[in-house]
Amino acid sequence: MDLQRFNFLIMTTQGRVATMSFMSLDHAQKVDLAKTGLFFHNNLIKCIGCRATMDRVDARRVKRHTYSDTCVSAINALVANESLRKRSFASFKWARRQFGSRAREVDMLSRRGFYCVGKRLRCAGCKVVTTCVSVDGAQRAHAADCAFRRVFDVDLDACALANVVRVDLPPPRLEPRPSAPFDAAVSECKVCFVNEKSVCFLPCRHLVVCAECSPRCKRCCVCNGKIASRLSTIPQ
């Protein structure tokens, strides 16, 4: 493969996964690596968004790259992928200790753009770094123009949800639709434009001519296919 085609290939996640076809990893691992910009070339794992290179898949270096604040590809993946941000809270010892029994807060923080890196929280949108472990504190740390600043949660408790389910909503109003007017041009013979089409050509199965014009046709008027036989139908 020439260099130009290879450069186009690694521009997409699927293309970067394709470069890892010879690596002894399962498909899910390859996709995770490719989403953060990594691809395989000349026996090295490289990144399209930064200068990171690895001669093998090193879990610690991969984790550091995945949650990097300098790699363009990794940052884009974190901005777009809430589950990737959420996964960071299980990837660092400090986060596991702080949020091990606070799954709801992890959901709320990752929804607001935050992910864990080391012993801090960082926003994928505005790049702000905070040591706050509360949702309110982290939310206040956002930059004023951060896209994640105005995220909020809709909380329906079990009682409210049950009330919504029990509501007897009226059926939707169905407006009668006027029937479409008959279009004579649709059913007329495509040869004489007078009679109604009633002969189906086989094997192409195109219904385009009337019984009078059918014998004159050696090939189908639509697909130009050779007519093997004809099937007469009842005009509509």
UniProtKB/Swiss-Prot annotation:
Zn(2+) binds at C123, C126, H142, C146. InterPro entries: BIR_rpt (IPR001370), Znf_RING/FYVE/PHD (IPR013083). Keywords: Apoptosis, Metal-binding, Zinc, Zinc-finger. BIR repeats lie at residues 85-150. A zinc finger (RING-type) spans 189-223. GO terms for molecular function: zinc ion binding. It comes from the Viruses. PROSITE patterns: BIR_REPEAT_2. This is Probable apoptosis inhibitor 2. It comes from Orgyia pseudotsugata multicapsid polyhedrosis virus (OpMNPV).
